């Protein structure tokens, strides 16, 4: 059996496209390769190079494959879901050029502020919010399949 293991920039503490406290993308990719990972997901849009030739070159230098792109947002919000769908379309232009990138990682937003810890969304969903959450996931899924 041949198993390949992948990782993501968030394993290196990367949550934002740009933040001076985060590991620089070059170091992140180097350490992923040095750790023996075979595949990576793109992480937050704009953190790794998002131009095909540049990303392809950086992946090949490190013998890594792109396996997925990532969407993060408030899945209980119709407005945020529409923004995620627009971002999915933008990312698809890049993703579809990599045969190995067959997945989209979908992550709901945190319910606390990542810098202050302040509660910014309900910690628990009520029935209506849960229904909206599922509806919006299915909406993104259906759009991705189209």
Map each language-model feature to its residues.
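A short hydrophobic beta-strand element
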Residues: 102-104
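N-terminal pre-domain/capping segments
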Residues: 1-100, 123-145
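Short glycine-enriched loops at secondary-structure junctions
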Residues: 59, 106-112
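Active-site-proximal beta-alpha loop/turn segments in soluble metabolic enzymes
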Residues: 110-126, 146
């Amino acid at each position: 059996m041949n198993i390949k293991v992948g990782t993501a920039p968030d394993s290196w503490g990367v949550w934002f496209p740009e933040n001076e406290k985060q590991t620089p993308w070059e170091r992140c990719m180097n350490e992923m390769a040095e750790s023996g990972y075979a595949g990576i997901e793109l992480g937050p849009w704009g953190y790794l190079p998002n131009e095909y030739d540049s990303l392809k070159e950086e992946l090949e230098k490190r013998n890594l494959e792109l396996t997925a792109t990532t969407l993060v947002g408030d899945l209980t919000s119709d407005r945020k879901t529409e923004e995620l769908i627009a971002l999915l379309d933008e990312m698809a232009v890049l993703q579809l050029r990599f045969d190995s990138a067959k997945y989209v990682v979908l992550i709901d937003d945190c319910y606390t502020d990542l810098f202050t810890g302040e509660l910014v969304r309900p910690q628990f969903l009520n029935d209506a919010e849960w229904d909206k959450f599922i509806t919006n996931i299915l909406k993104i899924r259906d759009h991705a399949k189209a």
